[in-house]
Curated annotation (Swiss-Prot):
Its main location: nucleus. One of its GO terms (biological process) is stomatal lineage progression. Residues 1-20, 69-113, 504-529, 623-655 are annotated as: Disordered. It comes from Arabidopsis thaliana (Mouse-ear cress). This is Protein tesmin/TSO1-like CXC 2. It comes from the Eukaryota. The gene is TCX2. Residues 1-16, 76-89 have a biased composition (Polar residues). PROSITE patterns: CRC. Residues 507-516 have a biased composition (Acidic residues).
Amino acid sequence: MDTPQKSITQIGTPISKSRFEDSPVFNYINSLSPIRPVRSIPNPNQFSSLNFTSPPSVFTSPHLTSSHKESRFFKTHNSSSSDPTNSVESQEDESTSHEEVPAEGEDTKGLNIDDCMREEASVETNLDDSVASPCGGNTTDLSLVPYAPTRGEDGSCEDNGMELQKMHDNVQGKTETPDWESLIADASELLIFDSPDASEAFRCFMMQRASNSEARFRNGVEKQTMQHDSNKEPESANAIPYEAVSLLHRGIRRRCLDFEMPGNKQTSSENNTAACESSSRCVVPSIGLHLNAILMSSKDCKTNVTQDYSCSANIQVGLQRSISTLQDSLDQTENEIREDADQDVPVEPALQELNLSSPKKKRVKLDSGEGESCKRCNCKKSKCLKLYCECFAAGVYCIEPCSCIDCFNKPIHEDVVLATRKQIESRNPLAFAPKVIRNSDSVQETGDDASKTPASARHKRGCNCKKSNCLKKYCECYQGGVGCSINCRCEGCKNAFGRKDGSSIDMEAEQEEENETSEKSRTAKSQQNTEVLMRKDMSSALPTTPTPIYRPELVQLPFSSSKNRMPPPQSLLGGGSSSGIFNSQYLRKPDISLSQSRIEKSFETVAVDGAEQMPEILIHSPIPNIKSVSPNGKRVSPPHMESSSSGSILGRRNGGRKLILQSIPSFPSLTPQH
């Protein structure tokens, strides 16, 4: 291909439309359209400067100049949406590329190859700058304004130039503002956080202070914007440095993109008035939610915000002063409300209303029987005109707490209520009297004093208890805390407050009698217990098999031989083992009884001094009341004793058989042994 040589040889010669469209240079220029690369770059989230750069220092003074700060906010707001500079550039190049074709259709008034090559070089330079920028083509060089072709036929290029001039003037006007104040003015949207609660709280706090000066502020905005637009000077030759723009995006993208709410971003079509209104929403310098408290804690925290570029208004906000004035106003209003309440509402009714909810007050009202408190009736068919309606019986009207249906016990039906009361009183004069009547107010129905209940009060109708003995809550007398009276028809009354058939003295006497009877029963039981113990001891002292008792007529027992006779008792006492038997047979009372062991030990002494030691009771006749019922006594027969000169103890029978008696175990005696 030798197209470059042809283009060089044909420089300065006019060419036709068909030859120019077929030239490779025209095709190459059309392929280098800047619209596609510029529109594919403006996504700010694809760069990692937000993640890898450290946040700026908070407590140190701002390091960037005022122009850098203002440009930083301007660039960041437009980076997420459509960049105004990129749009201007794209419109410029697009208008250039589109206007060349109709110009060639008109045989292009003096257009040559040098103009096309110059335009190609400018497009390449602009593309390289946009690609080399780390912020996605946001650093547009404003020096491209002179290269924009101006055509007045359709006005498209002139409109683009005016838009670019307005944007540049806006940037230049922002650079003239002070450092800290302009940072606050353009950082108004930084205080719109993702959290709706935080934004709402901050908005409520600031709108109280700024609501008064909002009207004056807008009036100043309208006046100053007109003067500011008339005093503008075109400074399109100045350009923003590349390093400054890159630093702007590094420093501000971290705060705006993460904390800014969508829909509240500035666009390139906003005018100066809208910008002034948006910046006037926040006039307080702020660092962050967690550092605002440190900034506001200073005593003399005042900020002078001067907005020269938009309205040249001077707003002075004192945080501590505004808070103190707000607190003073609140205290003043509270004091006024208290004074009004003290003057209008008396103290005693208020205290009574507060005391209505206390249980003691309710209890006193219920006990007093006065119809002051409504008991919240629940009538459905009686229309609250019967005695079982507690409100009607108490003489009060039904109020809101009552859940009655079709109620006539209200002030609007006063005539019906009074007529019903008179009709009921004509039949029973005490119908509407209190249930519990005190002694001072009670009237004796009979002349006897005994008819009066000894308790402090009595029930007007009385109870009708049958099985509860007036000791349960459904007894009206017991429930009212009064004793039963003669009017009561109860049975087996045991009312603790007073019985209907007696006085309190009788009740005390009955209680004393009950106590005495209980004591007597206790003593009787103790005596019975002692007697039982004594009987047990006596029964244990007697032998298990008592021997038969001999009477005087039985002293001479019949024997087989009439010659043999029983020896006298003196001879019997001298015997060995048999003497114990007869001795035990003669014992009649426990106080003179002797144990068998002791008798066995003193056999010899008894034999010697038998006549002297014999008790008199043994000589006399025995007691005939004791009878022998032991079968052993019937079988045992006394042995035949033969008198012998030797005085032998053992006797012999005729048959030569000996009587062998087993030893009887000894039993303890009841009397002490000496």
